[in-house]
């Protein structure tokens, strides 16, 4: 038993639990259709008041459906807020009711086909999406024929609520397995021919494999694929889709890629199934989760354990747009070229744009890893520069140390702003680079300042870079002065 469940419940736990139980009791007195409609009204209120969550949902919908008009995006977000609360409230109520009442609200049209696909399965791994009323996942033992059932879940901070969730699911024959305790019990269920379910469509952090979801790389849990391969389990993917007020349909399909398919291939295919399910009813998915979360500090992906997997049939990736503010002097710009090249090669979807003084624009266009160059004309102030780059980039990386460079990207509202801590500009940045350690008896070479940035954000510093093509065919003699007033 975990340490958490050995702890005593606090007064706050008791108060929250009392409110939850009271609300559940009052809702249980109402018809489920009324609860659904009332939940939609509460959800609309949340849409109006919860501006940060509305922005997050809007951003996610725009990533998934970049061709949608703004009005279509907003309609999807509004409907999502409404149906999300409606489904959650109905899930609370139906979770307390007997199966003979609950099944009146479920469409079983596809269950027969699912049963045929899994009849001879040794065991089953069910990859569940946050679609519709996912709380009805606990009903699996009532319509699937397996000796045991388990679900991997994240424990509640409130000890009393956590115990209530466990008891409610066990009442239906579903064992709740806290994922922080490991998967020994889940593996045991599979070994005994059971079914193990888990939610699969959330950001998996550093432990996930980066595969496309709607054409944009997303960290995705490979756990369902790993368990299915090791246990020789049949893999199902799906959820409980909303098809009307207080009405849901079971949609689970067999994922058959063959025994030879790799973990990465299976994980990628799971994301494709998630896409297909979302496209059937876009407002039904959980858009309030930061599914395409940018990792920190290593938002370049070359050094992650599981790395990136791109299926051979995948569409072109949506670009991960990186703005790099170049130094203003030619010598400094030359010394930063290697860092720019390594940053570009840090992830397959990287699109690098250099923000430079106009006098350096032609120089940066000769670097093959640079996709675009934006020039800063003489006399342009920070507000004018910010207008040029506003809403166009996910990341801004600052090579110069001046406060103005921080102000430019802050005014442009670029989400991630990266650079060294320097006087008068720390307020404008939200990711800081540690100073490089001195190399040997003298101070580090100035190029190391830029390479340290690339290293800290996840670039591969060991990769051999291809040679840059010659700019001109005729031989020339170039003289370099390897020094500066402030260092080598």
Pin down the residues of each PLM region.
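Membrane-anchoring hydrophobic helices of lipid-metabolizing enzymes
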Residues: 2-128, 133, 162-167, 173, ...
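Catalytic core of membrane glycerolipid acyltransferases/transacylases, capturing the structured
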Residues: 122-180, 203-209, 216, 361
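Generic beta-sheet signal
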Residues: 122-128, 149, 194-198, 233, ...
């Amino acid at each position: 038993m975990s340490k958490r469940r050995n702890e005593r419940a606090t007064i706050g736990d008791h108060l929250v639990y009392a409110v939850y139980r009271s609300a559940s009791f009052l809702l249980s007195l109402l018809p489920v259709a009324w609860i659904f409609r009332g939940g939609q009204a509460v959800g609309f209120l949340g849409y109006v008041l919860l501006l940060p969550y509305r922005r997050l949902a809007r951003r996610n919908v725009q990533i998934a459906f970049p061709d949608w008009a703004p009005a279509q995006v907003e309609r999807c977000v509004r409907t999502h807020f409404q149906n999300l609360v409606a489904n959650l409230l109905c899930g609370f109520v139906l979770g307390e009711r007997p199966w003979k009442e609950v099944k009146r609200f479920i469409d079983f049209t596809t269950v027969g086909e699912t049963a045929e696909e899994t009849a001879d399965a040794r065991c089953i791994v069910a990859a569940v999406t946050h679609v519709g009323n996912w709380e009805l996942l606990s009903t699996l033992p009532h319509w699937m024929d397996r000796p045991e059932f388990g679900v991997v879940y994240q424990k509640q901070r409130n000890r009393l609520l956590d115990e209530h969730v466990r008891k409610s699911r066990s009442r239906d024959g579903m064992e709740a397995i806290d994922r922080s305790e490991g998967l020994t019990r889940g593996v045991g269920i599979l070994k005994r021919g059971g079914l193990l379910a888990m939610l699969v469509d959330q950001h998996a952090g550093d432990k996930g494999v980066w595969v496309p979801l709607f054409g944009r790389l997303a960290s995705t849990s490979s756990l369902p694929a790993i368990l299915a391969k090791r246990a020789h389990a049949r893999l199902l993917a799906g959820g409980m889709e909303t098809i009307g007020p207080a009405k849901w349909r079971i949609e689970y399909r067999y994922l058959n890629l063959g025994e030879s398919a790799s973990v990465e291939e299976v994980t990628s295919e799971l994301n494709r199934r998630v896409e297909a399910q979302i496209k059937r009813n876009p407002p039904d998915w959980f858009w309030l989760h930061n599914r395409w979360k940018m990792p920190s500090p290593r938002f370049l992906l070359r050094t992650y354990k599981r790395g990136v997997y791109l299926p051979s049939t995948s569409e072109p990736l949506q670009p991960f747009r990186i703005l790099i503010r170049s130094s203003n002097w030619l010598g400094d710009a030359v010394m930063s070229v290697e860092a720019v090249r390594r940053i570009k090669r840090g992830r397959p979807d990287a699109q690098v744009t250099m923000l430079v003084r106009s006098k350096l624009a032609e120089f940066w266009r000769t670097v093959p890893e640079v996709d675009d160059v934006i020039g800063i004309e003489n006399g342009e102030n920070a507000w004018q520069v910010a207008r040029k780059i506003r809403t166009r980039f996910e990341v801004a990386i600052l090579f110069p140390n001046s406060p103005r460079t921080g102000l430019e990207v802050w005014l442009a509202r670029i989400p991630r702003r990266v650079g060294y801590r320097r006087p008068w500009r720390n307020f404008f940045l939200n990711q800081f680079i540690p100073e490089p350690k001195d190399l040997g008896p003298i101070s580090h070479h100035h190029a190391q300042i830029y390479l340290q940035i690339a290293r800290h954000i996840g670039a591969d510093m060991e990769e051999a870079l291809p040679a840059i093509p010659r700019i001109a065919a005729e031989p020339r003699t170039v003289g370099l002065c390897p020094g500066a007033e402030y260092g080598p």
